[in-house]
């Protein structure tokens, strides 16, 4: 009859997870997201597990959710998953008041972020090396 309201924007071999309103600035979150881009999913989980940054555990939870979505919802092979995209976006800014001297005030801004992780199934590396040799 009509098109679905939200057509699938991902490929058949991709799955995603989205976390909204994380209490960290986008600049800091992007540093951690850069550690896992274009890495195999198992290696990315290991990197985040042993990272010293506070936000790394929230990123790890989102990555594990994307892996679970790939396995359960899209029947993808977990061993072949690669982090294709780790997108960081701005969210709300919470503004606070800070009293200063001589009756003045200043503003404290607390930034929030969105995180979207897309994992995709890649073919085995042995097949790609055979194609290059041919």
UniProtKB/Swiss-Prot annotation:
One Gene Ontology cellular component annotation held by this UniProt entry: cytosolic large ribosomal subunit
* Keywords on record: Ribonucleoprotein, Ribosomal protein, RNA-binding, rRNA-binding
- Give the Gene3D superfamilies listed for this entry: Ribosomal protein L22/L17 (3.90.470.10)
GO BP? translation
Q: What HAMAP family does UniProt report for this protein, alphabetically?
A: Ribosomal_uL22_B
Q: How does it assemble?
A: Part of the 50S ribosomal subunit.
Spell out the family assignment given in the record's similarity comment.
Answer: Belongs to the universal ribosomal protein uL22 family.
Q: What is this protein called?
A: Large ribosomal subunit protein uL22
Source organism: Gluconacetobacter diazotrophicus (strain ATCC 49037 / DSM 5601 / CCUG 37298 / CIP 103539 / LMG 7603 / PAl5)
């Amino acid at each position: 009859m009509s098109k679905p309201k939200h057509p699938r924007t991902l490929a058949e071999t991709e799955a995603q997870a989205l976390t909204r309103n994380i209490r960290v600035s986008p600049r800091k979150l992007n540093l951690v997201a850069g550690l896992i881009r274009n890495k195999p999913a198992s290696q990315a989980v290991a990197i985040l597990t042993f990272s010293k940054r506070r936000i790394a555990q929230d990123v790890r939870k989102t990555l594990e959710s994307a892996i679970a979505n790939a396995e359960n919802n899209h029947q993808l092979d977990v061993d072949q998953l690669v982090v294709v995209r780790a997108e960081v976006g701005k969210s709300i800014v919470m503004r606070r008041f800070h009293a200063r001297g001589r009756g003045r005030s200043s503003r404290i801004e607390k930034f929030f972020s969105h995180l979207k992780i897309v994992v995709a199934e890649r073919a085995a590396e042995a097949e790609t090396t055979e194609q290059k040799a041919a």
